[in-house]
């Protein structure tokens, strides 16, 4: 755990050079959950060494799974029997990703409990999409005071209609269907990058899946999976977006290599309309043969506020996790930007923390905020918000703010971003770590 770790930033410096996009946090945690389906050895390649992954490794080890690092690869070997009673409750409550264990564990355990999950603190995040999706397969979920009780008498293939295009609910449904013999269909599924990643992994395990990249997935489930496999995790669009925002706000020319372009096209379109100058080249596929990559060459640009509200939508819309970056980008854009963060009850409230750096914001309600630019950002000491993306935009703002800033208790950033200090230093940022 890194609860007492801080970042100290001497801001106002230009960045330059090339940064490679890190591998996907959300893809990695989904595949850690999916690995429980396999009775054979799973090698996950290019796994980001981040706190969210560390927590899930602790959970896996606590229930008897052997997990070992080999450089940036994880070697995962299941036990003969899952010891769910010994689950590391502290680690499990640190991450909402634990919910995705339901779809895998139900094939080994007819009845079990999971601790209530945590992760980002963004208001109520209902498990109802999971409950309604999985009950079609014969899986019952009860939310108790401090844990979830999961049980099933008989698993059956099913047609599932998701009333909410949830990434994790889609993944849970995929994992549930994977080891139920027969054909299952998931309608109105998320097609986001971590869902496509999970589909690619399940295909490698021998599960037939049609419709990858669309909103209707057809799964040809198999009774048992026992294969020794290797699978490489793809690049993270939210990691690329962090460096796009950092380059824009510091007025820098930077290249982001191996960016997953299909999950950044709407973001780049908006930024282009705001005045960002950039070029794309070197198209290729990631090792999973699904994710399309390009290099993004950003130029220092003068931005104007986007004339319409900026809001996120399920893929192929602007990514929900990338929306917060537009708040800090708005501080350097000429004019007033309206951001509508409709997904979470209070994430927009965290955007007002930019005021500590000299931004001018007006919070209209818990979902809508106006940001006036350009602002002359100044150094400050800020306690890191407990939610990942709001925390990162404070860091981006501090990179541009002249003077010495301190961002305290940065665990929430290290949950999702790998080697962020070293990678920023490589681009010329003056940033160091310190402890309380």
Show where each model-derived region lies.
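Short, structured segments at the rim of ligand-binding sites
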Residues: 1-436
